[in-house]
Amino acid sequence: MARVTVEDCVDKVENRFELVLLASHRARMIAAGAPITIDRDNDKNPVVSLREIADSTLTPDDLKEDLIQSLQKHVEVDEPESEVVPALSSAPQNPEAIGDIQFDRMTEEDLLRGLEGLVPPAETEDDSE
């Protein structure tokens, strides 16, 4: 039965590897409780999914889109962008003020004293494995 079903499906999905991906995804959907669009006839889920594809009760494009969506970990949402993004507002407006910026200086001895005061975090059970 499966050989005949696969031969019927090749007309709908030309690439056999893609057919396997789509049919296995549909079989997992059926196992998860998705409604079946044809009579089961005591067939297992992979055969039912192949028969659904062969009978065109499900379109391969819809299955492909559903498969891609199920594999995505992050769905990108288009958000409207603000019309004008202000430049760094904290930057000085006139170029002469750039030379007046002060930076804190630290000597190597100050850095070493600061590092000596740091305490490593306590080891947890997860770290020891």
From Swiss-Prot:
EC number(s) stated in the UniProt entry for this protein: 2.7.7.6
Keywords: DNA-directed RNA polymerase, Nucleotidyltransferase, Transcription, Transferase
A Pfam family recorded for this sequence: RNA_pol_Rpb6
Stored InterPro entries: DNA-dir_RNA_pol_omega, Pol_omega/Rpo6/RPB6, RPB6/omega-like_sf
Gene3D superfamilies in the record: 3.90.940.10
Region (Disordered): 77-98
Single GO molecular function: DNA-directed RNA polymerase activity
Domain of life: Bacteria
GO cellular component: DNA-directed RNA polymerase complex
GO BP: DNA-templated transcription
Catalytic activity: RNA(n) + a ribonucleoside 5'-triphosphate = RNA(n+1) + diphosphate
Annotated family: Belongs to the RNA polymerase subunit omega family.
Subunit structure comment from the entry: The RNAP catalytic core consists of 2 alpha, 1 beta, 1 beta' and 1 omega subunit. When a sigma factor is associated with the core the holoenzyme is formed, which can initiate transcription.
HAMAP family from the UniProt entry: RNApol_bact_RpoZ (MF_00366)
Record NCBIfam families: rpoZ (TIGR00690)
Function recorded in the entry: Promotes RNA polymerase assembly. Latches the N- and C-terminal regions of the beta' subunit thereby facilitating its interaction with the beta and alpha subunits.
Listed name of the protein: DNA-directed RNA polymerase subunit omega
Species this chain originates from: Methylocella silvestris (strain DSM 15510 / CIP 108128 / LMG 27833 / NCIMB 13906 / BL2)
